[in-house]
Amino acid sequence: MVERKKWSENFSEWFNEVIEEAGILDKRYPVKGMNVWLPYGLKIMKNIEKFIHEEMERTDHQEVLFPALIPETEFQKEAEHIAGFEGEVFWVTHAGHEPLDVRLVLRPTSETAMYSMFALWIRSHADLPFKVYQIVNVYRYETKHTRPLIRVREISRFFEAHTAHADFEDAERQIKEDLEIFDNLMKKLAIAYVISKRPEWDKFPGAYYSLGAEVVMPDGRTLQIGTMHNYKQNFAKAYNILYEKEDGTHDYVHQTTFGMSERLLAAVIAIHGDDRGMVLPPTIAPIQVVIVPIPKKGSEEEVYSYAREIEEELKLAGIRVHLDLRDKRPGWKFYDWELKGVPVRIEVGPRDAAEKTVVLARRDKLEKITVSREELVDKVRELFDDIMQYLYERAKEWLESHIKRVDTIEEAKELFNDRRGIVEIPWCGEEECGLKMEEELEAKMLGIPYPEESARVEGKKCPVCGREAKFIARFARTY
């Protein structure tokens, strides 16, 4: 039976234990907020990134790789941007013993690194749309409590796509494409999420508007796992990114960005997990099937031989399989592979070897079935599909049950006291009222549902000022 008691009641402790014991990260590195990726964790992350690369290829983004250091002179060009980031950047002030004439910033994000180069590369309307991406390390001096994968000082798997367009309409089309890419990726991870348009006071520094994608974690807090920003011409004007139009005149480009990080893995671990550990979607599991031989005395040769045959058959079928021949008891191995979230376990004993059958145990529901050797590959593939569907449906049900709509501050407070995730409240649209609600609820406004039409509301009053509400606003306690 699947238990999620510790997972929900003591999520922080559960998460830290799983990260460590399942071999995802080692957080004992001697710089706070910087962690060491372990082989198993890195393999999962690389499998997630494989889907990102595929989506980038499909949508004609080109991969680039920019330096990690940005001169202070470039960093300062967009005033709103630097004001938003100045307090959380790492500065390089010396080279050897000598102070630098121009200080360098370890990139917190790459707008200021990339856009001086965009100004050199983009010349004409024929160069547009211009679409690039990279997956790099970025650095932010987080002063809050750091937490592996969730809040770190070195985001080591930071995906950022940067695009330039001839006009606002084409930039808007890009945002729609980003949302489609994100949705495709979330389907591969079996994750349900919401998209919100950030309030003016919480949009990305330098953006015209920002969108954020959130999931609800087991403790009721939300985790931002993706962002899309439309910059209009704000950065293009600061970095002089001009192009020649078809009529021979010049104009500034319109720009967008799209970002994700290892928080994707944090969401997978948190949302699909249970008290036994991780439950990985087969799409990204480094090991999709683990074979555990269970020989009795005198039957070792037959059982191991049969297990190797099964391993070979699954490998030939393109399934990522591992045969566990460690000198440990079967129960210990079951515990270990359940902790690591391997989607399907195959148990092979003397009777299975004799009767040409196998026992399949699925990690998500902790259920077992016996199947014949002939139907093994088909059955395993069928199980993968079933697991993906079950994980997504469970994640969707979890998310939907943690979004509640109320009319008053008092009702919202009660829900937050009960750790109920996202609370939706009518809002007049005025910043003063939004900030007042944040203060009263001790929660953050995620924004309004996106697309904006779905956020409009009629016949409701703003609980702060009593005026007619224009939107539904989402609030949450966040990471």
Swiss-Prot record:
Protein localization: Cytoplasm
One GO BP annotation of this record: prolyl-tRNA aminoacylation
Domain of life: Archaea
Main localization (coarse): cytoplasm
UniProt GO molecular function: ATP binding; proline-tRNA ligase activity
Statement: the UniProt record of this protein carries the keyword Lipid biosynthesis: no
Catalytic activity line of the entry: tRNA(Pro) + L-proline + ATP = L-prolyl-tRNA(Pro) + AMP + diphosphate
Keywords: Aminoacyl-tRNA synthetase, ATP-binding, Cytoplasm, Ligase, Nucleotide-binding, Protein biosynthesis
Main enzyme class: ligase
Cellular component per GO, a single term: aminoacyl-tRNA synthetase multienzyme complex
Enzyme Commission designation: 6.1.1.15
Coiled-coil blocks: none
PROSITE patterns from the UniProt entry: AA_TRNA_LIGASE_II
UniProt-listed InterPro entries: aa-tRNA-synt_IIb (IPR002314), aa-tRNA-synth_II (IPR006195), aa-tRNA-synth_II/BPL/LPL (IPR045864), Anticodon-bd (IPR004154), Anticodon-bd_dom_sf (IPR036621), Pro-tRNA-ligase_IIa (IPR002316), Pro-tRNA-ligase_IIa_arc-type (IPR004499), Pro-tRNA_ligase_II_C (IPR016061)
Described function: Catalyzes the attachment of proline to tRNA(Pro) in a two-step reaction: proline is first activated by ATP to form Pro-AMP and then transferred to the acceptor end of tRNA(Pro).
Membership in a protein family: Belongs to the class-II aminoacyl-tRNA synthetase family. ProS type 3 subfamily.
The protein's assembly and partners: Homodimer.
Domain notes: Consists of three domains: the N-terminal catalytic domain, the anticodon-binding domain and the C-terminal extension.
Protein name per the record: Proline--tRNA ligase
Organism from which the protein derives: Pyrococcus furiosus (strain ATCC 43587 / DSM 3638 / JCM 8422 / Vc1)
